[in-house]
Amino acid sequence: MSADPRHYDVIVSPVITEKATNLTEQNKVVFRVAPKATKPQIKDAVEKLFDVKVTGVNTLTTKGKKKFFRGQRGQRSDVKKAIVTLAEGDTIDVTTGL
């Protein structure tokens, strides 16, 4: 399977938190994705980039917090995350190299 350069625009980065690490026991991996990425695009990108079989994709959007910076009111960017469920026997180790 060859990776299309557009797949790199869909997957921004892996999410490495305690909660995301606990999901690996359930064969799930969490990624930050582009805000306009759809579930089929995310599934295709993960399958092509990591050479695994994806059985499901759940997405969530975390709204950015309102903050004050130098007396000005601003807002952090919204973040879209995808929880990708892998087929039995497939794994993605995103914690190597830390």
Swiss-Prot record:
Q: Which GO terms describe its biological process?
A: translation
Q: Where is the signal peptide?
A: none
SUPFAM superfamilies of this UniProt entry? Ribosomal proteins S24e, L23 and L15e
What is the designated name of this protein?
Large ribosomal subunit protein uL23
* Function statement: One of the early assembly proteins it binds 23S rRNA. One of the proteins that surrounds the polypeptide exit tunnel on the outside of the ribosome. Forms the main docking site for trigger factor binding to the ribosome.
Q: Which Pfam families match?
A: Ribosomal_L23
Gene3D superfamilies hit by this protein: 3.30.70.330
What are the record's GO terms for cellular component? ribonucleoprotein complex; ribosome
Give the record's keywords alphabetically: Ribonucleoprotein, Ribosomal protein, RNA-binding, rRNA-binding
Say yes or no: keyword rRNA-binding present: yes
How does the record describe its quaternary structure?
Answer: Part of the 50S ribosomal subunit. Contacts protein L29, and trigger factor when it is bound to the ribosome.
